[in-house]
Amino acid sequence: MAVSVTKEEMDYTIKPEAGASNISTEDWPLLLKNYDKLMVRTGHFTPIPAGCSPLKRDLKSYISSGVINLDKPSNPSSHEVVAWMKRILRAEKTGHSGTLDPKVTGCLIVCIDRATRLVKSQQGAGKEYVCVIRLHDKIPGGEAQFKRALETLTGALFQRPPLISAVKRQLRIRTIHESKLYEFDNDRHLGVFWVSCEAGTYIRTLCVHLGLLLGVGAHMQELRRVRSGAMDENNGLVTLHDVLDAQWMYDNQRDESYLRRVIQPLESLLTTYKRIVVKDSAVNAVCYGAKLMIPGLLRFEAGIEVNEEVVLMTTKGEAIAIGIAQMSTVELSTCDHGVVAKVKRCIMERDLYPRRWGLGPVALEKKKLKSAGKLDKYGRANEDTPAKWKTEYKDYSAPEEASAHAASESTAKEDVAAALTTEQDEAPSSPQSKMDVDETKEEKKRKRHEGETAEERAERKRKKKEKKEKKERRKSKQEKEDSDDSD
């Protein structure tokens, strides 16, 4: 407990620095551990007084961004246990890392409120089990024969879910990574083994297959999950009673230390991911779904590959999102522009950090030109746009052909319409020509909405929806009046 208190009291934050850091970060918590070993793109950034270290969150935020490594008891189902947790902690949402059968015990990661966004990633993570198997008869080869059979059942295996399972009984392929025999008693027909496997593996089916291999038949007697994803039973495992007592202590004694001990920050599930540290000024843009670009990058881990899942984090060690890397470590070290990662699952709340986009010199110049009417409302060039802007400004968000077309386009709408009319008069009407006209209309429509911001798109869609609803109301009113007249 003394260690956790000390960790909460200390200030764990990446500070702006001119040279290499001399601080040892081996004992720093969660995502900041060994951050000094990360590769540095730049040490310069402006810290923003927003957000805080995961261990220093106020209790409400700590619980709503927390996970519990629960020791599931035997008999209740996983869904029942999670529902009880929701009621005990008075949370809005809870989720778990993968179903355990009612009789199975062990690690069940319960995610609370904001942390439920990580449920999908944890359900697909690897699992480890310890199983007690009961054979239906003695085997002549004894322990050696059992070991051989266990080794045979490694790698990719065909499995069909047991009858007891509440899922469709389809044949599926699951991988057994490793297995070890702990104990075997041929006289009592019992064996205990450990297995590391892919998510969705049925150990009950594995036991039946072992029995078939040994030629005597077998079934699963008992099962315990000892690891689920990033958490194992040595990593702060708590019981339902611990959670109930911790909540009672807070309600009656106002002592939150027990709740902080049973609940861990959601960042503890992401320690196995490769890290990318984001500048404070870029955090809120990523929360709104923006891709992380090179200027917003501070540090990154070695060995990142393209399309690999990474965790985007703040300088205070908070997880922002799970992203898909768009550049490898080598490219990140050498490039000065481009997309670093795109967001797969956003974790952090929006507007926890202030908005900082649109405040650069180019963005401010663009705003001035838009307000002066020298750019259209979507920021695209028109006939009044200065030649210097057309040549120097590069729009990275727009497709190259579209921006080139927009820059070179000087024909008035009337001329285009006149040209189209002339072509229609000259050419005989055919299905092909109609299709061409339709394509032209679609292209025009697409270009008209190109380059608009998320807020402008949302506003346009809202107006369109209101117009549609108004039209439907008018239509239904007209139909009602017509029916009244006919009566």
Swiss-Prot record:
EC number: 5.4.99.-
Region (Disordered): 400-487
PROSITE patterns: PUA (PS50890)
Molecular function terms, GO-annotated: DNA binding; pseudouridine synthase activity; RNA binding; snRNA pseudouridine synthase activity
Catalytic activity: uridine in 5S rRNA = pseudouridine in 5S rRNA; uridine in snRNA = pseudouridine in snRNA; a uridine in mRNA = a pseudouridine in mRNA
Pfam families: DKCLD, PUA, TruB_C_2, TruB_N
Residues annotated as the enzyme's active site: 101
Predominant localisation class: nucleus
Compartments (UniProt record): Nucleus, Nucleolus
Compositionally biased region (Basic and acidic residues): 435-459
Coiled-coil residue windows: none
Domain PUA: 273-348
Biased composition (Low complexity): 400-410
InterPro entries, per the entry: Dyskerin-like (IPR012960), PsdUridine_synth_cat_dom_sf (IPR020103), PsdUridine_synth_N (IPR002501), PUA (IPR002478), PUA-like_sf (IPR015947), PUA_sf (IPR036974), tRNA_PsdUridine_synth_B_fam (IPR004802), TruB_C (IPR032819)
Sequence ranges of Basic residues compositional bias: 460-477
GO BP field: box H/ACA sno(s)RNA 3'-end processing; mRNA pseudouridine synthesis; rRNA pseudouridine synthesis; snRNA pseudouridine synthesis
Keywords from the UniProt entry: DNA-binding, Isomerase, Microtubule, Nucleus, Repeat, Ribonucleoprotein, Ribosome biogenesis, RNA-binding, rRNA processing
One GO location term (cellular component): box H/ACA snoRNP complex
NCBIfam families tied to this protein: CBF5, PRK04270.1, unchar_dom_2
Subunit structure of this chain's protein: Component of the small nucleolar ribonucleoprotein particles containing H/ACA-type snoRNAs (H/ACA snoRNPs).
Family affiliation: Belongs to the pseudouridine synthase TruB family.
Functional summary from the UniProt entry: Catalytic subunit of H/ACA small nucleolar ribonucleoprotein (H/ACA snoRNP) complex, which catalyzes pseudouridylation of rRNA. This involves the isomerization of uridine such that the ribose is subsequently attached to C5, instead of the normal N1. Pseudouridine ('psi') residues may serve to stabilize the conformation of rRNAs and play a central role in ribosomal RNA processing. The H/ACA snoRNP complex also mediates pseudouridylation of other types of RNAs. Catalyzes pseudouridylation at position 93 in U2 snRNA.
Name of the protein: H/ACA ribonucleoprotein complex subunit cbf5
Organism expressing this protein natively: Aspergillus fumigatus (strain ATCC MYA-4609 / CBS 101355 / FGSC A1100 / Af293) (Neosartorya fumigata)
High-level lineage: Eukaryota, Fungi, Dikarya, Ascomycota, Pezizomycotina
Gene assigned in the entry: cbf5
